Amino acid sequence: MKRLIVILLGCLHLAAVHAQEFGGQLISEWQWDMNQHTNWLNQVRLDLNLPLWHGRGAIEAATLHLANIRHEALIDDWQGFSNIEAGNMLAAIAVLGYSHHWASARVFVGVRNVNEDFFTSPVTALFANSSCGIVPTIAASYPIANYPFSGLTFYFDVTRGRFTFRNSLCNGVG
């Protein structure tokens, strides 16, 4: 038993040596429809960044874990009123791919959610009335990788002074 524990800890140590950044975020909300129904929603996001090539490149990974106590939504509306309500889901891939950085540009190739770069801020999940996570006409009219789904993506951005130009080529919902 000791040998097994030592081997497992050694493997974890080797994996942790290369992990430059590992983080998590928990967002929880309680819903009430002002009648008899309530719901408790939780979203856990785990992020991992493994630097390569002396910090110029990186393997990026992020997963979303969603849980709520009700199987159906509180209101009969396809948009809902929560930025994190998406049904129960274990380990949905939000980001998985390779990014490379230059002085003023960045390229990413892999699986990515469109909300990662364009339609959200670090505090978006804390507000109600999500409009499906992004601009509602985009979410309703085009098959894009909207929250909580991701799709194959080629993304790049270029920064000049105060301006940043961003562009993505996505294959739709993954």
How would you name each of these model-derived features?
Residues 4-13:
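Sec-dependent N-terminal signal peptides
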Residues 15, 173-174:
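Short, intrinsically disordered, charge-balanced linker/junction segments flanking boundaries
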Residues 18-33, 57-61, 130:
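Transmembrane beta-strand segments of Gram-negative outer membrane beta-barrel proteins
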Residues 31-35, 80-84, 139-142:
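Extracellular loop and loop/strand-boundary signature of outer-membrane beta-barrel proteins
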Residues 34-37, 71-73:
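Short, glycine/acidic-enriched capping/hinge loops at junctions between secondary-structure elements
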Residues 38-52:
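Short catalytic helix/loop segments, enriched in acidic residues and glycine
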Residues 50-137, 147-172:
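Outer membrane beta-barrel
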